[in-house]
Protein backbone atom coordinates (compact mmCIF):
# COMPACT_ATOMS: atom_id res chain seq x y z
CA UNK A 1 0.00 0.00 0.00
CA UNK A 2 2.91 2.36 0.68
CA UNK A 3 4.24 2.21 -2.88
CA UNK A 4 0.77 2.63 -4.38
CA UNK A 5 0.05 5.62 -2.14
CA UNK A 6 3.37 7.17 -3.17
CA UNK A 7 2.66 6.55 -6.86
CA UNK A 8 -0.81 8.04 -6.52
CA UNK A 9 0.55 11.14 -4.75
CA UNK A 10 3.37 11.58 -7.27
CA UNK A 11 0.96 11.09 -10.15
CA UNK A 12 -1.43 13.72 -8.81
CA UNK A 13 1.50 16.10 -8.39
CA UNK A 14 2.69 15.44 -11.96
CA UNK A 15 -0.80 15.95 -13.35
CA UNK A 16 -2.10 18.85 -11.36
CA UNK A 17 0.48 20.71 -9.37
CA UNK A 18 3.49 20.73 -11.67
CA UNK A 19 1.88 20.62 -15.12
CA UNK A 20 -0.89 23.08 -14.30
CA UNK A 21 1.41 25.54 -12.52
CA UNK A 22 3.97 25.46 -15.34
CA UNK A 23 1.27 25.87 -18.00
CA UNK A 24 -0.35 28.80 -16.22
CA UNK A 25 3.01 30.52 -15.77
CA UNK A 26 4.81 29.71 -19.03
CA UNK A 27 1.96 29.57 -21.54
CA UNK A 28 -0.72 31.58 -19.73
CA UNK A 29 1.57 34.41 -18.63
CA UNK A 30 5.05 34.40 -20.22
CA UNK A 31 4.09 33.19 -23.71
CA UNK A 32 1.10 35.50 -23.99
CA UNK A 33 3.19 38.55 -23.12
CA UNK A 34 6.13 37.61 -25.34
CA UNK A 35 3.82 36.77 -28.25
CA UNK A 36 1.94 40.07 -27.83
CA UNK A 37 5.27 41.93 -27.68
CA UNK A 38 7.26 40.19 -30.45
CA UNK A 39 4.77 38.15 -32.46
CA UNK A 40 4.01 34.45 -32.38
CA UNK A 41 7.23 33.10 -33.94
CA UNK A 42 9.69 34.99 -31.72
CA UNK A 43 7.54 35.00 -28.58
CA UNK A 44 6.87 31.28 -28.74
CA UNK A 45 10.53 30.41 -29.30
CA UNK A 46 11.55 32.68 -26.42
CA UNK A 47 9.11 31.16 -23.92
CA UNK A 48 10.04 27.65 -25.04
CA UNK A 49 13.75 28.37 -24.49
CA UNK A 50 12.98 29.72 -21.01
CA UNK A 51 10.95 26.59 -20.27
CA UNK A 52 13.81 24.35 -21.44
CA UNK A 53 16.32 26.39 -19.42
CA UNK A 54 14.24 25.89 -16.27
CA UNK A 55 14.34 22.14 -16.75
CA UNK A 56 18.10 22.24 -17.35
CA UNK A 57 18.51 24.24 -14.13
CA UNK A 58 16.51 21.57 -12.30
CA UNK A 59 18.91 18.90 -13.63
CA UNK A 60 21.88 20.94 -12.45
CA UNK A 61 20.37 20.90 -8.97
CA UNK A 62 20.54 17.11 -8.78
CA UNK A 63 23.42 14.74 -8.22
CA UNK A 64 22.85 13.00 -11.58
CA UNK A 65 26.01 12.67 -13.70
CA UNK A 66 26.03 15.54 -16.18
CA UNK A 67 26.61 13.87 -19.51
CA UNK A 68 26.18 15.72 -22.81
CA UNK A 69 23.24 13.45 -23.65
CA UNK A 70 21.46 14.40 -20.41
CA UNK A 71 22.09 18.10 -20.98
CA UNK A 72 20.66 17.86 -24.48
CA UNK A 73 17.67 15.74 -23.50
CA UNK A 74 16.75 17.87 -20.51
CA UNK A 75 17.10 21.09 -22.52
CA UNK A 76 15.76 20.05 -25.93
CA UNK A 77 12.76 17.91 -25.01
CA UNK A 78 11.14 20.52 -22.72
CA UNK A 79 12.00 23.30 -25.18
CA UNK A 80 10.29 21.49 -28.05
CA UNK A 81 7.38 20.52 -25.81
CA UNK A 82 7.03 24.14 -24.66
CA UNK A 83 6.88 25.35 -28.26
CA UNK A 84 4.36 22.68 -29.28
CA UNK A 85 1.98 23.23 -26.36
CA UNK A 86 1.98 27.01 -26.83
CA UNK A 87 1.21 26.47 -30.51
CA UNK A 88 -1.53 24.01 -29.55
CA UNK A 89 -3.02 26.46 -27.04
CA UNK A 90 -2.96 29.42 -29.40
CA UNK A 91 -3.97 27.69 -32.62
CA UNK A 92 -6.42 25.06 -31.38
CA UNK A 93 -7.34 26.01 -27.82
CA UNK A 94 -8.46 29.59 -28.41
CA UNK A 95 -5.71 30.75 -26.04
CA UNK A 96 -6.73 28.40 -23.21
CA UNK A 97 -3.97 26.54 -21.38
CA UNK A 98 -6.20 23.43 -21.13
CA UNK A 99 -4.83 21.65 -24.25
CA UNK A 100 -1.27 22.36 -23.16
CA UNK A 101 -2.04 21.22 -19.64
CA UNK A 102 -3.35 17.89 -20.95
CA UNK A 103 -0.27 17.41 -23.15
CA UNK A 104 2.08 18.50 -20.37
CA UNK A 105 0.43 16.24 -17.78
CA UNK A 106 0.71 13.30 -20.18
CA UNK A 107 4.38 14.04 -20.80
CA UNK A 108 5.00 14.28 -17.05
CA UNK A 109 3.36 10.90 -16.46
CA UNK A 110 5.39 9.27 -19.25
CA UNK A 111 8.56 10.84 -17.86
CA UNK A 112 7.65 9.80 -14.32
CA UNK A 113 7.42 6.19 -15.49
CA UNK A 114 10.25 6.13 -18.05
CA UNK A 115 13.05 8.07 -16.35
CA UNK A 116 13.55 5.66 -13.42
CA UNK A 117 13.65 2.79 -15.91
CA UNK A 118 16.02 4.44 -18.39
CA UNK A 119 18.09 6.95 -16.44
Give the predicted meaning of each segment.
Residues 5-119:
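Transmembrane helix-loop-helix hairpins at the membrane interface
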Residues 1-3:
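Interfacial loop-to-helix junctions that mark the boundaries of transmembrane helices
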Amino acid sequence: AGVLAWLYTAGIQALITTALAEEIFFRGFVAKRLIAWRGFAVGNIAQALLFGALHLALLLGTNAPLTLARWLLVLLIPTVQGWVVAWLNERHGNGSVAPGWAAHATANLVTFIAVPLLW
